[in-house]
């Protein structure tokens, strides 16, 4: 739960911009080129523009935002994108109300508050590794907090590795003229994660408190080879094959988690 600071009486509107960014990875092993292609097709179907639109619509509802516009696109050969413009003010039908009644907040926020997702399925050309990456950004202006959607997004996608960044920018001014650069308490993104999520993931923080920048990386603690095999079961593989595949997968996870290639 996002705990606000003691209520401030503001001069005008709350102009703080809060942005939450996710990189979510699903890692898989597919033995043949045909299996890797089927994995790409499976992921592309599982996370097409329609499914992603539903996920982002749910996010808007969770954070208490109103949807202004939705743009979505599936790509050839694979991948999809969805962008939703949001506001914290109710949407007023122009046909039922004069233009002068349309909330200024709605108009002002159309280029600031948004939720976007882009997907990137890909495969290794030789080693059988296939990955799916989803980049998600939730940016809000005002009192709406994107942190409320943390757990839902992690649970909605096949999240082997999650890289999260949260930052607060701008300021809001109170009636005495004093500027406030953040309006809620936060020490780490981890404090907003549900217990069942935290119990499943190994987590690491890099935070710059004075700049209101918070960064958390996490990957699954438990490694179950069957969860990473596509169209195959570990029991059908020889011990040597299992060890080879497990080594490849753990290396891939480690490299994605740290964001750099490991030495041979």
Curated annotation (Swiss-Prot):
<dbReference type="InterPro" id="IPR003826">
    <property type="entry name" value="AdoMetDC_fam_prok"/>
</dbReference>
<feature type="site" description="Cleavage (non-hydrolytic); by autolysis">
    <location>
        <begin position="112"/>
        <end position="113"/>
    </location>
</feature>
<keyword id="KW-0620">Polyamine biosynthesis</keyword>
<comment type="pathway">
    <text>Amine and polyamine biosynthesis; S-adenosylmethioninamine biosynthesis; S-adenosylmethioninamine from S-adenosyl-L-methionine: step 1/1.</text>
</comment>
<feature type="active site" description="Schiff-base intermediate with substrate; via pyruvic acid">
    <location>
        <position position="113"/>
    </location>
</feature>
<keyword id="KW-0704">Schiff base</keyword>
<keyword id="KW-0670">Pyruvate</keyword>
<feature type="active site" description="Proton donor; for catalytic activity">
    <location>
        <position position="141"/>
    </location>
</feature>
<keyword id="KW-0745">Spermidine biosynthesis</keyword>
<keyword id="KW-0456">Lyase</keyword>
<protein>
    <recommendedName>
        <fullName>S-adenosylmethionine decarboxylase proenzyme</fullName>
        <ecNumber>4.1.1.50</ecNumber>
    </recommendedName>
</protein>
<comment type="subunit">
    <text>Heterooctamer of four alpha and four beta chains arranged as a tetramer of alpha/beta heterodimers.</text>
</comment>
<keyword id="KW-0210">Decarboxylase</keyword>
<dbReference type="InterPro" id="IPR016067">
    <property type="entry name" value="S-AdoMet_deCO2ase_core"/>
</dbReference>
<dbReference type="Pfam" id="PF02675">
    <property type="entry name" value="AdoMet_dc"/>
</dbReference>
<dbReference type="GO" id="GO:0004014">
    <property type="term" value="F:adenosylmethionine decarboxylase activity"/>
</dbReference>
<dbReference type="GO" id="GO:0005829">
    <property type="term" value="C:cytosol"/>
</dbReference>
<comment type="function">
    <text>Catalyzes the decarboxylation of S-adenosylmethionine to S-adenosylmethioninamine (dcAdoMet), the propylamine donor required for the synthesis of the polyamines spermine and spermidine from the diamine putrescine.</text>
</comment>
<feature type="modified residue" description="Pyruvic acid (Ser); by autocatalysis">
    <location>
        <position position="113"/>
    </location>
</feature>
<dbReference type="GO" id="GO:0008295">
    <property type="term" value="P:spermidine biosynthetic process"/>
</dbReference>
<keyword id="KW-0865">Zymogen</keyword>
<feature type="active site" description="Proton acceptor; for processing activity">
    <location>
        <position position="118"/>
    </location>
</feature>
<keyword id="KW-0949">S-adenosyl-L-methionine</keyword>
<keyword id="KW-0068">Autocatalytic cleavage</keyword>
<dbReference type="InterPro" id="IPR009165">
    <property type="entry name" value="S-AdoMet_deCO2ase_bac"/>
</dbReference>
<comment type="similarity">
    <text>Belongs to the prokaryotic AdoMetDC family. Type 2 subfamily.</text>
</comment>
């Amino acid at each position: 739960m996002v705990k606000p600071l003691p209520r401030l009486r503001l001069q005008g509107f709350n102009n703080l911009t809060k942005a939450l960014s996710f990189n979510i990875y699903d890692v898989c092993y597919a033995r043949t080129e045909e299996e890797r292609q089927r994995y790409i097709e499976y992921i592309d179907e599982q996370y097409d523009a329609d499914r992603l639109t539903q996920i982002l619509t749910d996010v808007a509802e969770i954070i208490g935002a109103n949807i202004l516009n939705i743009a979505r696109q599936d790509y050839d050969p694979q991948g999809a994108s969805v962008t939703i413009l949001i506001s914290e003010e109710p949407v007023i039908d122009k046909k039922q109300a004069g233009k002068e009644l349309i909330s200024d907040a709605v108009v002002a926020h159309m280029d600031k508050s948004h939720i976007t997702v882009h997907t990137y399925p890909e495969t290794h050309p030789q080693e059988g590794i296939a990955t799916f990456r989803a980049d998600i950004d939730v940016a809000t202006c005002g009192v709406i907090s994107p942190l409320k959607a943390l757990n839902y997004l992690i649970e909605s996608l096949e999240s082997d590795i999650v890289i999260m960044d949260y930052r607060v920018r701008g300021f809001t001014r109170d009636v005495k003229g004093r500027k406030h650069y953040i309006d809620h308490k936060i020490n780490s993104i981890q404090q907003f994660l549900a217990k069942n999520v935290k119990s499943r993931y190994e987590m690491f923080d890099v935070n710059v408190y004075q700049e209101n920048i918070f960064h958390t990386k996490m990957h699954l603690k438990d490694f179950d080879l069957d969860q990473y095999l596509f169209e195959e079961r570990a029991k059908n593989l020889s011990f040597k094959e299992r060890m080879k595949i497990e080594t490849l997968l753990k290396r891939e996870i480690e490299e994605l988690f740290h964001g750099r290639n490991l030495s041979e």
